């Protein structure tokens, strides 16, 4: 009987329940609650469920004491040396294997490949001026970098230059880009930045409208834009090739993201590789999304997530996103003035690369002011330009700080 009781005691002492009673054990319980809350947002509120659901579940798995699903000490530093590869293969958990795709920068470009197969660049080709709106929305990234450096200079929080650059990319409202940049510059902040980036992407319909209305007049919001011209198939095919060459020559570090985005789009527009285009946009993208979200979620352990840095990242991320939206709208106002009122400034807010949510918000706000107005296709131009812009901004940040 005594041996049986000792066995039960031993089982309990080696269980995760016992570890909750250890110093700091309550932090893991808090993180599990945070993961459950994110699951609620994904399932009930449908906030970015494709990403948030596996990410939140990964967060829960990583904070179950003793699960051993990931060992972040393997990934400290800029690269993986040969002995560490062997250590991961022999003793690593499931998330260690999956996280190698993040560490090596494999998943985000493949996500961009899938995005390219679903993206229509015709509105941008039809109205090249909308590229300026997509570029203007990236000012939020660089403005937030300066804000993070200011916080560091005043001693409020000790963000390094690389960490500041990684945080600022949240302003692009592009989850894969944020993960790609952070994994290169500040992998220790990956979980916090990924959660913030995807949360703000889901909150686009909440965050953007007040900013759009505050910066525009009713007259500007009711502007009806001319119908876009038809774009030939030849131009649709030439565009991704031309963009890849030009952008890669100007910003080589952006080549991998822009190149994969344009490869996916070329598959779509060429019309000769339907089978692999559908695979890239459906099966492959779905698989990579699961791997990416789960492995990133597993990096959000209590000791790296529950600190003051996370709070500042969330605040700076909101500032970055708001600045990007405001910059796009202000650029739209300039174009409104220069064209004699032919451009509706509301489409400028779609310059952030949350596709197609930001464009839908422009459409919704515009239609609330003028029910006969249809801005969706006009807003898609800046929206897809924002995807290119965020990839270019990522390349610039990696080039400077990588």
Predicted regions and their residues:
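Intrinsically disordered, low-complexity non-transmembrane regions of multi-pass membrane transporters
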Residues: 1-23, 29, 75-87, 91, ...
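Flexible hinge motifs at transmembrane-helix junctions and intramembrane kinks/re-entrant loops
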Residues: 39-53, 57, 66-69, 154, ...
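Interfacial helix-loop-helix linkers and transmembrane-helix boundary segments
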Residues: 43-52, 70-72, 98, 118-133, ...
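Hydrophobic transmembrane alpha-helices of secondary-active transporters
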Residues: 61, 99-125, 264-267, 285-307
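Alpha-helical membrane segments and immediately flanking helix-loop junctions
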Residues: 100, 104, 112-118, 133-143, ...
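Entry/N-cap segments of selected transmembrane alpha helices
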Residues: 123-145, 303-328, 379-383
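Membrane-embedded hairpin module used as a gating/binding unit in multi-pass transport
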Residues: 196-272
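Transmembrane helical segments that form the transport core of multi-pass membrane transport proteins
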Residues: 244-331
């Amino acid at each position: 009987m005594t041996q049986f009781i000792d066995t039960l005691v031993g089982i309990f002492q080696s269980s995760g329940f016992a570890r909750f009673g250890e110093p700091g054990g309550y932090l893991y319980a808090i993180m599990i609650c945070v993961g459950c809350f994110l699951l609620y947002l994904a399932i009930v509120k449908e906030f970015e469920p494709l990403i948030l659901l596996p990410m939140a579940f990964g967060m829960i798995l990583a904070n179950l004491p003793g699960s051993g699903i990931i060992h972040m000490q393997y990934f400290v530093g800029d690269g993986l040396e040969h002995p560490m590869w062997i250590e991961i293969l022999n003793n690593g958990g499931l998330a260690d294997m999956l996280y190698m795709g993040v560490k090596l920068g494999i998943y985000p470009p493949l996500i961009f490949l899938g995005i390219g197969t679903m993206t229509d660049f015709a509105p941008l080709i039809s109205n090249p001026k909308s590229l300026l709106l997509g570029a203007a929305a990236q000012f939020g990234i660089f403005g937030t970098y300066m804000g993070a450096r200011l916080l560091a200079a005043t001693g409020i929080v000790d963000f390094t230059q690389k960490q500041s650059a990684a945080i600022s990319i949240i302003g692009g409202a592009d989850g894969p880009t944020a993960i790609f940049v952070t994994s290169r510059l500040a992998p220790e902040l990956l979980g916090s930045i990924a959660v913030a980036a995807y949360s703000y992407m889901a909150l686009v319909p909440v965050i953007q409208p007040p900013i759009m209305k505050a910066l525009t007049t009713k007259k500007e919001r009711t502007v009806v834009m001319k119908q876009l011209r038809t774009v030939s198939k030849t131009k649709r095919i030439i565009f991704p090739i031309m963009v890849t060459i030009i952008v890669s020559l100007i910003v080589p570090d952006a080549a991998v993201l822009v190149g994969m985005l344009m490869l996916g789009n070329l598959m779509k527009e060429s019309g000769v590789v339907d089978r692999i285009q559908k695979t890239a946009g459906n099966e492959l993208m779905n698989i990579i999304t699961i791997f990416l979200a789960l492995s990133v979620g597993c990096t959000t352990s209590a000791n790296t997530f529950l600190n003051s840095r996370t709070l500042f990242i969330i605040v700076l991320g909101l500032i970055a996103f708001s600045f990007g939206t405001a910059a796009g709208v202000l650029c739209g106002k300039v174009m409104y003035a220069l064209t004699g009122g032919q451009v509706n400034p509301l489409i400028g807010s779609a310059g952030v690369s949350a596709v197609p949510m930001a464009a839908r918000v422009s459409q919704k706000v515009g239609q609330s002011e003028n029910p006969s107005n249809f801005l969706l296709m006009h807003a898609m131009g800046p929206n897809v330009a924002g995807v290119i812009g965020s990839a270019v901004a990522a390349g610039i940040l990696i080039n400077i700080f990588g």
